Amino acid sequence: MHPFDIRTILFAKHAQHVVLIHFPIALFIIGVFFDFLGQWKRQQLLAVAAYYNLCVAAIATLPVVVTGIVAWQWELEGQKLKGILLMHLVMGCVSSVLICLVWFIHMRTRREQEDLPGYRLPIEAAAVGIVALTGHLGGFLSGVNG
């Protein structure tokens, strides 16, 4: 197995998920950071940066969920989920829904030209925590965290 062999890159049993997952995590966390900073500094430009980061993060969750399910099917041949893998799958789905919810709140208020609601900030903070916990569980599955 050669690290630059295209077949190795494209057809490794779970490599795509491991590579793709970092994009929505990073985009979401920095989007929430920009939103909190924009709220604190009252700068519209930061709110715009937050919106676009959250938008791309929401879009990026789709291939991540698909590759996660494919990795489960290929790597474990569709075995019954249990333990950390089950928690990771459930938390991954919850994380994806929360990322999309946060983006939807921003998109709706942007489209209707309203001020962003204050209730979004605790939702965003909780979502960052859930995303981080999901990533932590994924690290255990990949062997990075233990």
Question: Predicted segments — roles?
Answer:
Residues 1-146:
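Polytopic transmembrane helical bundles with strong interfacial aromatic enrichment
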